[in-house]
């Protein structure tokens, strides 16, 4: 036995598992960017990162607030007096003032139409940690969750890798803007049951830049209520909605429906997308189930948010004037950036999935595929990464059922970089069309030449045939079958 094999025997199955999801093109694109990152002056030919759903559009507002409120940080002269209180061990339930500030912020980000209890707010290390925590609370290894496609590429890691939970895709179609239908849910649920898979719940997220309307949400709640399975709503893009229909939380739906088993309803939230603070690693599990809240709180000790971060954000999120202005601005700025990018694509003849929220669009490049297969999608994606030098995410990495869709993020860069990205896409599209037209012209010319050649050959045959006939009739040298010479 080789040394490597012996060493592997000493490791866990998890350590040797390939189920983390790193093999996905979603992560490969990030590596391409990391190896050759674009910079306007130092590396203008580098790869532009458009595979990262990050909100950098309102960081100036946060910076300005920090300047005006230096006492909010324990690392400033104005806030140093609180250093000892914050630096010591804190209960992993989280600072009370922080949980209250988060609950209030969640209410305001949802238009003040719902109320959240601070005691149900459980901290976690980003939405990644929150999603995994809720899986540990709701399912055992081998159990499964229904997840409509396309879905967030990293769900394969967040939901499955350490928990052993299975994902059952619910296939949705572009024919209705990838909306979730009851028929698709019932079909996926029935197939899972027929194969002996235990379905524990349904997870809905937003990888498309769309928001769910009231009717769809009511249908989903009715579905899980009838099946008595859980509903986990990933609401991390709540404040990025910029057009109708506005964002509707599942919390709003269940307070309006006549009968709902609230123990089955859970929300995942974070400050990464709405506030543009992914580096702060603030995730939230909000559950209406007391047992889940208790379990999630105990598990939160494995992924705490630092007390320094909690203290700082508690101060900022408690400033209602700042929060109200921030929420208005983030919606305006996302709308402006979305319009800028989609309008630029439209001028090239590229359409996108109709969207009203999020930090990205689903770009339709089906017309640029060699054929309608995922192999062709991957071939096109490699060209975009290596030649166009833009990192976008192919639909297959989001388990999209149709090849040719690409998720492109537009809020993680400045406007100048976005314009450079649009120029690169334009050059690529124009070049692709020119090549196709050239190939088409060559094919047409070849067809015309072949047609001319065949026509010439046909006429030549007719001409030769005619000449032979005339020669047969007129030539004195031609010996007739009845010639006495032949008979002799």
UniProtKB/Swiss-Prot annotation:
GO terms for biological process: biosynthetic process. GO terms for molecular function: catalytic activity; pyridoxal phosphate binding. Expressed in young leaves and flowers. Not expressed in roots. InterPro entries: Aminotransferase_I/II_large, Ethylene_sulfur-biosynth, NHTrfase_class1_PyrdxlP-BS, PyrdxlP-dep_Trfase, PyrdxlP-dep_Trfase_major, PyrdxlP-dep_Trfase_small. It comes from the Eukaryota. The modification N6-(pyridoxal phosphate)lysine is found at residue 273. Keywords: Pyridoxal phosphate. Homodimer. Belongs to the class-I pyridoxal-phosphate-dependent aminotransferase family. This is 1-aminocyclopropane-1-carboxylate synthase-like protein 1. The gene is ACS1.
């Amino acid at each position: 036995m080789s040394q490597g094999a012996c060493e592997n025997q000493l490791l866990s199955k998890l350590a040797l598992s390939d189920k983390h999801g790193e093999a996905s093109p979603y992560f490969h694109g990030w590596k391409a960017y990391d190896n050759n990152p674009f910079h306007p002056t130092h590396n203008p030919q580098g790869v532009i990162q458009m595979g990262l759903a990050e909100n950098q559009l309102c960081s100036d507002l946060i910076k300005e607030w920090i300047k005006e409120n230096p006492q909010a940080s324990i690392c400033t002269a104005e806030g140093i007096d609180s250093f000892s209180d914050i630096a010591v061990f804190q209960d992993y339930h989280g600072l009370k003032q922080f949980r209250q500030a988060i609950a209030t912020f969640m209410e305001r980000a949802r238009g003040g139409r719902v109320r959240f209890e601070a005691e149900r707010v459980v901290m976690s290390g980003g939405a990644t940690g929150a999603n995994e925590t809720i899986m540990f609370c709701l399912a055992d290894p081998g159990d499964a969750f229904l997840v409509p496609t396309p879905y967030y590429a990293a769900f394969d890691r967040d939901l499955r890798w350490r928990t052993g939970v299975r994902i059952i895709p619910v296939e949705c179609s572009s024919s209705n803007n990838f909306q979730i239908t009851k028929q698709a849910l019932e079909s996926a649920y029935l197939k899972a049951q027929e194969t002996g898979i235990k379905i524990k719940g349904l997870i809905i997220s937003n990888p498309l830049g769309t928001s769910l309307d009231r009717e769809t949400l009511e249908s989903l709640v009715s579905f899980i209520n009838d099946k008595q399975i859980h509903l986990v709503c990933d609401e991390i893009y709540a404040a990025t909605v910029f057009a109708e229909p506005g964002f509707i939380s599942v919390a709003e739906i269940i307070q309006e429906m006549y009968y709902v088993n609230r123990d089955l309803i859970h929300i995942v939230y974070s400050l990464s997308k709405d506030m543009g603070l992914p580096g702060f690693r603030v995730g939230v599990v909000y559950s209406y189930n007391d047992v889940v809240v208790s379990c999630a709180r105990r598990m939160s000790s494995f992924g705490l948010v630092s007390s320094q971060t909690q203290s700082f954000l508690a101060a900022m999120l408690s400033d209602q004037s700042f929060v109200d202005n921030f929420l208005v601005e983030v919606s305006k700025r996302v709308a402006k950036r979305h319009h800028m990018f989609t309008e630029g694509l439209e001028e090239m003849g590229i359409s996108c999935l109709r969207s009203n929220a999020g930090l990205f669009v689903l770009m339709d490049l089906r017309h640029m595929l060699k054929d309608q297969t995922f192999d062709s999608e991957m071939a096109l994606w490699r060209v975009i990464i290596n030649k166009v030098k833009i990192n976008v995410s192919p639909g297959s990495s989001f388990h999209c059922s149709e090849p040719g869709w690409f998720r492109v993020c537009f809020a993680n860069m400045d406007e100048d970089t976005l314009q450079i990205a649009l120029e690169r896409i334009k050059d690529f599209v124009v070049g692709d069309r020119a090549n196709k037209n050239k190939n088409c012209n060559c094919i047409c010319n070849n067809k015309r030449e072949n047609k001319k050649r065949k026509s010439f050959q046909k006429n030549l045959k007719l001409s030769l045939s005619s000449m032979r006939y005339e020669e047969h009739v007129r030539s004195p040298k031609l010996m007739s079958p009845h010639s006495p010479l032949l008979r002799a």
